[in-house]
């Protein structure tokens, strides 16, 4: 269901970009140990294992976006490069991954070399909030759970439009503010999670649709897939209780402790409707004539 048209403005969380960089520099090894090759939600249909569910989410987004084989792709907020390498392997894409973290870029580049993909992928250290499109446009922009960190999303989507070729596609998976986020308890829960997860803001499905349309793109898909991805945080909460995590957590700094303790809150936010998870696909109009 594609909706939109909202005048509500989500609260902004006071997040320092330097803290986001420090977070990923410090915790990327932990992410790799906890989540595996892909540091994003899974998509469950039939009780899949976590690794298969994470691949299924990428498959779902790529299928909806109709990513063509051999496409040039820009992955903004690429993390450890899981999607970059998967797109190169499965679709023979040439992919550039942007990450704010030098540590993530180094880890991703090493993985690309081990897989023999360094001739088709590259990783650049760049803050998406300051990213500017280059003269060479791309077939697709891929954003897997990173837009939560972007301060000015309307402006960001305008830059995406500039970076896409005519007929190019924008493919996004994003954490969202849910329908029950307006009441006091839901709002507090969203704020606690947003700050712990270093989000600039958490916004609604309607806001994403409106901003993408205002940027000049045609929205093809805007789907709430919360029910399929929610088991992610049950898995993460269980992993956080396994040795040595209960012993290590008290030794961590305050932001890391807040991050780890937000795992069960994500379960609550999805269960109560305070938060949701969206999948979006939009296309740049083809050139006329």
Where do the protein language model's features map onto the residues?
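Conserved alpha-helix/loop element of class I SAM-dependent methyltransferases that forms part
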Residues: 37-38, 48-69
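Class I SAM-dependent methyltransferase SAM/SAH-binding core
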Residues: 74, 83-130
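Short alpha-helix
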Residues: 200-222
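N-terminal auxiliary segments of SAM/dcSAM-dependent transferases
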Residues: 1-33
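A short glycine-rich, Lys/Arg-flanked "PGG" loop and its adjoining helix->strand segment in the class I
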Residues: 154-169
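A short acidic, Gly/Pro-enriched loop at the edge of an enzyme's catalytic core
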Residues: 129-141
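Conserved Class I S-adenosyl-L-methionine
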Residues: 221-289
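Short, glycine-/aromatic-enriched active-site segment of Class I SAM-dependent methyltransferases
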Residues: 176-199
């Amino acid at each position: 269901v594609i909706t939109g048209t909202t005048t509500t403005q989500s609260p902004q969380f006071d997040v320092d970009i330097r803290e986001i960089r420090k977070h990923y520099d410090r915790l990327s090894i932990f992410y790799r140990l906890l989540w595996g090759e892909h540091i994003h939600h899974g998509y469950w249909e039939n009780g899949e294992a976590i690794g298969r569910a994470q691949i299924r989410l990428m498959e779902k987004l790529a299928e909806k976006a109709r990513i063509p084989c051999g496409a040039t792709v820009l992955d903004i907020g690429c993390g450890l490069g899981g999607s970059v390498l998967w797109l190169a392997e499965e679709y023979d894409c040439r992919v550039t991954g942007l990450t704010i973290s030098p540590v993530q870029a180094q880890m991703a580049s090493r993985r690309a070399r081990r897989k023999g993909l360094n001739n088709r992928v590259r990783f650049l250290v760049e803050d998406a909030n300051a990213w500017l499109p280059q003269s060479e446009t791309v077939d697709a922009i891929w954003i897997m759970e990173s837009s939560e960190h972007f301060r000015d999303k309307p402006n960001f989507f305008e830059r995406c439009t500039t970076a896409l070729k005519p007929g190019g596609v924008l493919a996004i998976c994003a954490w969202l503010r849910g329908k029950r986020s307006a009441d006091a308890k839901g709002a507090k829960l969203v704020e606690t999670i947003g700050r712990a997860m270093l989000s600039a803001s958490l916004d609604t499905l309607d806001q994403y649709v409106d901003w993408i349309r205002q940027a000049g793109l045609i929205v093809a898909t805007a789907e709430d897939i919360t029910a399929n991805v929610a088991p992610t945080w049950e898995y993460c909460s269980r992993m956080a209780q396994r040795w040595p995590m209960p012993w290590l957590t008290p030794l961590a700094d305050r932001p890391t402790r807040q991050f780890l303790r937000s795992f069960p809150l994500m379960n609550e936010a999805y269960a109560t409707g305070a938060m949701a998870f969206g999948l979006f696909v939009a296309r740049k109009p083809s050139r006329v004539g």
